[in-house]
Regions:
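Short gly/pro/ser/thr-enriched loop/turn and capping motifs at secondary-structure boundaries
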Residues: 1-2, 23-27, 33, 43-44, ...
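Glycine/aspartate-rich loop-and-adjacent alpha/beta segment that forms the canonical ThDP
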Residues: 2-7, 198, 228-270
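Short beta-alpha connecting loops at secondary-structure transitions
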Residues: 3, 26-34, 121-125, 162, ...
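Thiamine diphosphate
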Residues: 12, 109-187
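A short alpha/beta connector and helix-capping loop motif
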Residues: 31-44, 166-183, 258-261
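Active-site diphosphate/adenylate-binding microenvironment
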Residues: 64-142, 148
Length: 270
């Protein structure tokens, strides 16, 4: 899933080196000067070996700005919990080689932007097909494939309800996972898009069950975050349990439009 070349190459005057497993498609805004087709891992290593070091500081500046953004709300105690704070606490509570399976919704926008990854396949997001409901069964699969690692399903309340019955599977097979539910009683991403495009929302709110009692009905542990400072210890305790834990975490999505406004002021130069 990528932006069409006409959005980032309107001038059509740049030199483009195409590095992919397949040949480039013909496009007026994507006229390549060189194609490196093959295993991307090996291709990048070979290209890196023959290129000259980049002396510019643009990437360093970008990296520093991202780090600043990631750290901005680390000590924020407002409630409901800001998306940035949830991600900070989650990243801090988990080891770097633990695994996150991210569902689809407003939380996916925040996770893909701000969740720091140091190892391959430690943050898996359904981005192409954008399949709501992937997080819980995906976390079960990840734990089966990597029983030595902690696994967390990060999901919105809507995505969680689409496949939450798979808690039964996890309990029956004794698969210990953590399910972190970002609770806003809404289709958060659709609400975000409606606010951006129309300045209002329509038919996106719904009523949730009691997620704590719902988890307990399967024999799992259910915990509700009632103060922001509770989130970190709740996460750590959940990661240490040898069973399924569902964490109901109210999220403050008033941050969404602030992010939209900030991103609208950015300009990418290539």
């Amino acid at each position: 899933v990528e932006y069409h070349p006409y959005l980032w190459h309107p001038s059509r005057d740049r030199t483009i080196v195409h590095i992919d497993t397949t040949h480039a498609e013909v496009d007026g805004h994507y006229s390549i000067s060189l194609a490196v087709v093959g295993n991307i891992r090996h291709s990048l290593n070979r290209v890196a070996a023959i290129t000259t070091p980049h002396q510019g500081k643009a990437m360093r500046t970008l990296r520093d700005s991202l780090i600043t953004e990631m750290n901005m709300h680390r000590d924020d105690l407002e409630f409901p919990v800001k998306p940035q704070k949830i991600i900070w606490d989650l990243r801090t509570a988990m080891d770097l080689q633990d695994i996150v399976i991210c569902d689809v919704g407003a939380h996916k926008m925040w996770m893909s932007r701000m969740f720091r990854c140091e190892y391959p396949n430690t943050c898996i997001i359904s981005n192409g097909f954008a399949s709501m409901g992937i997080a819980v069964p995906g976390a079960i699969a990840a734990k089966l494939a990597n029983p030595q690692r902690k696994v967390v399903a990060v999901t919105g309340d809507a995505g969680f309800l689409m496949n939450s019955q798979e808690i039964e599977t996890a309990m029956r097979l004794n698969i210990a996972i953590v399910i972190l539910v970002w609770n806003d009683a809404s289709y958060g991403l659709i609400e975000w898009k409606q606010q951006n495009q129309f300045g209002r929302t329509s038919h996106v709110q719904f009523t949730n069950p009691d997620f704590v009692q719902y988890a307990q009905s399967f024999g799992a542990v259910g915990v509700r975050v009632e103060e922001t400072e509770q989130l970190m210890p709740i996460l750590k305790e959940a990661l240490d349990r040898n069973t399924v834990t569902v964490i109901d975490c109210p999220v403050d999505y008033r941050e969404n439009l602030k992010l939209t406004e900030a991103l609208g002021q950015l300009t990418l130069t290539i």
